[in-house]
Amino acid sequence: MPLNSDKRAYRILISWTPASGGTEPIEYAAWLARTTPVEVRVLSAFVQPWHEVSMQKLGGKYNKWFAQEAKACKQAVKNTLRAAGIPREQWDKEYSVLMDGPSKPQLLTQAAEEFDADLVLLGPNQGAAKGRFLAGSTADSLLHYSPIPVGLSPRAAKLSKHGVTRLNFALTEEQGIDDVPALIDAAFLASTWNVPLRIIVFSSHGLVNAPINDNLDVALELTSQWREHSLGRLDIARERVGERFPDLEIRTEIGSGKGWRAAVDSLKWKKGDLICLGSSPMGALERVFIGWRATELLPHLSVPIIVWPSRKTS
């Protein structure tokens, strides 16, 4: 979510269809609705597999079928939003939209722009393990070009009834401490929602992970240098956030283990945790673009995620 200057509710576009295997993105939206005022709209995208000439031959038959699908989809969306506990006043007037086209990522981007969305929510590939996120083709595309922040939900995530209770920001090597805009965005949300901010550095190599034939002294020296470097980055991050948000509760931690799963699981996570990541810079383009480290990290995160587009420091 970007910084809202007009104080309006956060507009959330949810990617979901009744044929989806789960309701994770709608549950994610309901979780955010328990945290802050939101306005939600559900986009159900139908990808046309047929050539344009074939569509023209179908003519009115296709239009009639599409209208019937849109009506059925709207009823399913209505039932699911209610079941998730999102108050009716937080639904957009046009809360269910069915669109067709050759590309689902393009349809989502178009719909997000038309809705002036602050956030696009996507569910996991249903092949993901419970409590973990696995990107499908649509998520993978948006994570490499979306102009709008992208929210991702692990499969069957257990979320707090009290909404978001802590913001987390992950510093990766690609972004480093120079990724100030995304860090400041996370701090802004934490301050606005009156929740603490935890800034994290992850290492997937463990603090001591030397091969059998390596010199242990060298490994220990490298580990010591990495830890000192990481603590320095965390101190700078804490200082920069503290200057902008002096009343915000800020903690810093290092998650380390042999592999990303162990690094993530080395830290304590709560049902109210939301983790945020920035994007690797793409010149003048303000787009979501995750680097290889973030790509490796995502499948092991067990809490909802927001990935911000890169942008210049304001």
Name these PLM-found stretches.
Residues L119-S141, L274-H300:
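Glycine-rich, Arg-bearing micro-motifs that act as flexible, cationic patches
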Residues V150, T295-P299, V303-S314:
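Short, flexible loop segments at boundaries between secondary-structure elements
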Residues R41-L43, D92-D100, G151, R198-I200, ...:
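General small-molecule cofactor/ligand-binding pocket signal
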Residues L121-P124, P149-A156, G278, I305-P309:
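Short beta-strand elements of ligand-binding domains
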Residues M1-R8, K64, N79-V120, G242-I275, ...:
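Structural beta-alpha unit
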Residues P2-K61, T165-L220, G242-R251, H300, ...:
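Small/aliphatic-rich secondary-structure junction motif
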Residues G60-C73, A219-G232:
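A short acidic, glycine-rich active-site loop
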